Design a protein with these regions (language model features):
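Cytosolic-side transmembrane-helix boundaries in multi-pass membrane proteins
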Residues: 1-17, 23, 27, 226, ...
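Helix-loop-helix "hairpin" substructures at the membrane interface of multi-pass membrane proteins
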Residues: 188-267, 292-293
């Protein structure tokens, strides 16, 4: 019975353990953890606008988490989600700024396609290097993050035309036709920044789940991730599958970046560092055990922590401590074999009886 629910229990235990460890750390430093968590969850769920902001924060995380999950199923540890998301944001935003008067359906579809193409190309590069040269994907994707970061910053500052710029570091806002925000969602959520990106994310979850579990390509991705040599003997192309999985991974991350840019911020601006949605997306995927259907629930938790963190100030707790809670959750994901050992020992003990 425990094994049947182990996939669900382990992430749940990791999340609860992270919250408990966060509470212990707050207590050690002289803060009231109960009051802190009360304010955190009140800030996250106390009004409809905050709930809208949770769904706004979820959408890009779902996309980057799905991207990480696809690559992981192929045995590829994609640390380059931040760069892939940023390049998707920049090129989708550029297209939107250059064509402000196109019909809304054309602009939205155009930004989606361009973001996915840009992210897919960024993902293909480390995939090709891994498949044909055997390079370490971790090192390559980390370095790609910085190559893309500074290249995109250069494009914004020196390539974008002056009429697109509000100042040296930021563009003007995209037109209403290109914005992922809608009047009816703003009215529904009391002017939150919730946008159509959340609906794209739900569709993506279903598509990726179907791809990985019900298609030949999904079987090949999982097979290559388990044993590329055996997959080659079975007639599959491990190299082609690795590259294709990274293209899909990068495309998903690129669309996540576009949703962050055109849904949350409405413009394009120079970044001082890698996008948070990349590394947080990795955390979401790990918490969900790379399950497409589990990712929205993990993203909801991270969205709640993100939106509720400022409320901890009312409990006189530095909002930065929410990062400690998040890190604690990831820590317990990393040592989840302890939970597995515990659950398995229960099973063995039961069998011995």
């Amino acid at each position: 019975m425990l094994k049947k629910y182990q996939t669900l229990l382990l992430p749940l235990l990791a999340a609860i353990s992270g919250l408990v460890l966060g509470a212990i750390i707050m207590f050690i430093f002289g803060y009231d953890p109960i009051w802190g968590y009360e304010e955190l969850f009140y800030s996250a769920f106390g009004n409809i606008k905050s709930i809208g902001e949770i769904f706004r924060a979820m959408a890009p995380l779902i996309f980057t988490a799905l991207g990480f999950a696809v690559a992981s199923r192929a045995g590829f540890f994609n640390v380059g989600l931040s760069g892939q998301a940023y390049v998707g944001w920049v090129f989708a935003g550029w297209f939107a700024l250059l064509n402000p008067d196109l019909p809304r359906p054309v602009l939205i579809l155009g930004t989606v396609v361009i973001a996915m193409v840009a992210g897919g190309i960024a993902g293909a590069i480390p995939g090709i290097l891994r498949a044909y040269l055997g390079t370490s994907e971790v090192i390559v994707t980390i370095m790609m993050n910085y190559i893309i970061l500074y290249s995109c910053n250069y494009i914004i500052r020196d390539v974008f035309s002056e009429n697109l710029m509000k100042n040296t570091d930021s563009t003007i806002n995209v037109s209403a036709n290109a914005s992922y925000q809608t009047e009816w969602l703003r009215a529904l959520t009391n002017n939150s920044r919730m946008n159509i990106g959340i609906f794209f994310a739900i569709i993506a979850v279903i598509v990726v789940w179907f791809l990985l579990t019900k298609t030949t390509l999904g079987f090949e991705i999982r097979s290559v991730g388990i044993n590329p040599t055996a997959s080659n003997y079975a007639g599959m192309s491990a190299k082609q599958t690795i590259i294709l999985s990274m293209v899909i991974s990068g495309a998903l991350a690129g669309l996540g970046g576009a949703i962050q840019g055109l849904g949350t911020f409405q413009n394009v601006y120079i970044q001082s560092g890698n996008l948070d949605i990349g590394f947080n997306g990795m955390s979401v995927a790990l918490l969900a055990s790379n399950s497409p259907l589990g990712i929205p629930f993990a993203a909801f938790l991270f969205g709640t922590l993100s939106v509720g963190a400022p409320g901890m100030v009312r409990a006189q707790i530095p909002p930065e401590l929410i990062n400690v809670v998040t890190a604690s959750i990831i820590f317990f994901i990393g040592v989840k074999y302890i939970f597995e050992l515990f659950l398995n020992s229960k099973k063995v003990a039961k069998g011995a009886k």
